[in-house]
Amino acid sequence: MNGNNVKIFGDYQTPMYFAKQVCEIIKKSYFTIPDIIIEPNCGLGNFLVAAQEFFTTSTLFGFDISKEYVKATQNKLPHFAQNIICNDLLKNSLRNLIDVKSGSEVLIIGNPPWATNSQISKISGNNLPKKTNLKNLSGLECKMGNSNFDICEYMILYLIQDFINTNTTFGILCKQSVARNVFEEVAKNKIKCSDFRMYNFDARKVFNVGVDACLLLFKISTNAHCLNQCNIYDFDNPSNIISTLNYTNKKMYSCLDKNSINLDGRCCYEWRQGIKHDCASVMELKKSDKIYINKQNQRLELEDTFIYPLVKSSDIKSMQLDKIDRYVIVTQKKPKENTDKIQTIAPKTWDYLNSHIYEFQKRKSVIYKDSPNFAMFGVGEYSFKKYKVAISGFYKIPLFSLISTDKAVMLDDTCYFLSFDSFNEAYMMMLLLNSKPVQNFLTSIAFLNSKRPYTKKILQRIDIKKAFENTAFDELRKIETTLKNLPYFTKEMYDELRNLVFDLNKKSAETELQYYNTKGA
């Protein structure tokens, strides 16, 4: 399997030397010899061959969707050839194919596909599981990226459900983000588990891919208890714990620091993600005098009506930003809004968009399905407010920037922001979010080694009321001095915003209570 097939199946074959290292760690970590070893996606069979060397008395089973791989693995393991079967894990449960007797010890090992459904669909792959809402996401969450589920994560959760009432150890290679999500699901659903570990390794060295990866090792057991902690080790030095994940009060923490102030709660403001259009070569522009220039280097005379300043993650380098040199065409003020009005209001812009209609039609994401031509996502009334306090989702150190120009500024979908009509409110919020209590709290709940440490889910956990209660006026004044501005922030402004936040927090709590009362009625 090579070329596009490798991409479609998310297929990274595990080198034999590494499969043996994985089996060695599993054997040293768990003293019970498995009766049955299963590789759900066996590929060329390296894991099963390695497992046979370390667990000589175990019965081996291997499955793969590829007949080519099944044949290759059968040839390597002739003694278990009848147990190496062509099977689609997500269409035919392994429990239907293997007789797991009561009390048997099972080991599931392997390296499931490292791909998301959107990555596969972009290259027209059909190797997708039937989409079920395992995490009970809302319709909006499903459309805006949480539905961009990782195939590996889906398979692990599926296998946990399949083997829930057995004594089964999982030793799976996966992305670190997948391992964290699996731990959260196991802890949240109180699945009995005797141990939970991650062994981080260099995927570039092993697979030549730039991904934060790990060996996920845990055991579900009928005799175990519910865990709320996951220890993280270095694969090359597996005896030392390098960090710990905790699941406490229904929340995940990357680092529980006793010295940091717990600001966990629900933000009384709504964090928003920037706009999404998936057509940067057409929609994103630079400007030279009165001429716009797109990424294809076309020089364009366009009306300014639907063109707005644009900020990306790489632009957020300071606590205030008011000089912006890139632009974006914004075709809608709310999702699904008809775009035909552009033809009348800005005919040059309309003609330009239509000249590139094929590029819009190539967009694969489900959010554009049944939408008007040139549709976007992540737009609403909040997009057009003059003042925004934004953060890049990518940086390790959280930096919040106050962004404003004469015209409303758009952010791309790598950024998250709060929007305001009032400069004073935005300015104060920027200072508060850059304060030490908020910064320390964020680094205790964010996963700094992930590609996108800061997400809406993380930011929405900042309780602004608690932040005010733990941040004095003088501390915010100190932050202001680093801006090298004339003193602007006053005690009256501080008290005014503090009162506003307390009122918003109260209303937010009342609304949430009303929602749950209605839901339970």
PLM region descriptions:
Residues 1-76, 80, 93-96, 152, ...:
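Class I S-adenosyl-L-methionine
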Residues 7-21, 25, 41-60, 64-71, ...:
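Signature of N6-adenine DNA methyltransferases within the class I
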Residues 35, 106-107, 388:
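Conserved acidic residues
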Residues 200, 392-410, 439-449:
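Short, ligand-facing micro-motifs at secondary-structure edges
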Residues 200-201, 414, 436-464:
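Glycine-anchored helix-breaking recognition loops at helix->coil/strand junctions
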Residues 205-207, 214-390, 453-495, 499, ...:
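C-terminal substrate-recognition regions of SAM-dependent nucleic acid methyltransferases
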Residues 398-431:
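A short beta-sheet element
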Residues 419, 427-443, 477:
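C-terminal accessory domains/tails appended to large, multi-domain proteins
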